[in-house]
Amino acid sequence: MSENQKKIWITGASSGIGKAVAEKFAKEGWQVAGSARRKEILDDMAKNHNISSYPLDVVNEEDCSKTFDKIISEFTNIDLCIFCSGTYDPKKEKEINLKQNRFVMDVNYFGVLNCVKAVEIYFCNYLHLQHLRGKM
């Protein structure tokens, strides 16, 4: 991994949009930290691409922070984060299951918030991005 190589963290990297995004960035020469629940798929991707495997369930807030800390310790810095974790469970109106709907919201909404919370201090304090920094 070179000093000038761009580095990215992508969640949901084991399938769908997240996998396609991870593979595209890897092919373009970025060093990719890929996260998803399915470690075995991430490990297979790591064999064929410039992707490092960081298993993670985004529903767990503490694990999001620990995973990002581990990525920073190994990558030194991160230039970009893309949070693609998501799940979908189509139902008809008479099949609505509140427990399943809560899980979908935990992954699709709160999972993103957990990841944003994990990276917010890093990106707000990232010196060379000070001029791009937003306000909260």
Predicted segments, located by residue:
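Conserved hydrophobic beta-strands of the Rossmann-like cofactor-binding core
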Residues: 7-10, 81-82
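Substrate-binding pocket helix/loop in short-chain dehydrogenase/reductase
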Residues: 92-93, 97-105
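Conserved glycine-rich Rossmann-like NAD(P)H-binding loop of the short-chain dehydrogenase/reductase
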Residues: 28-45
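Conserved glycine-rich cofactor-binding loop
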Residues: 14-15
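Rossmann-fold cofactor-recognition segment
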Residues: 48-62
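Conserved NAD(P)H cofactor-binding loop of Rossmann-fold oxidoreductase domains
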Residues: 84-89
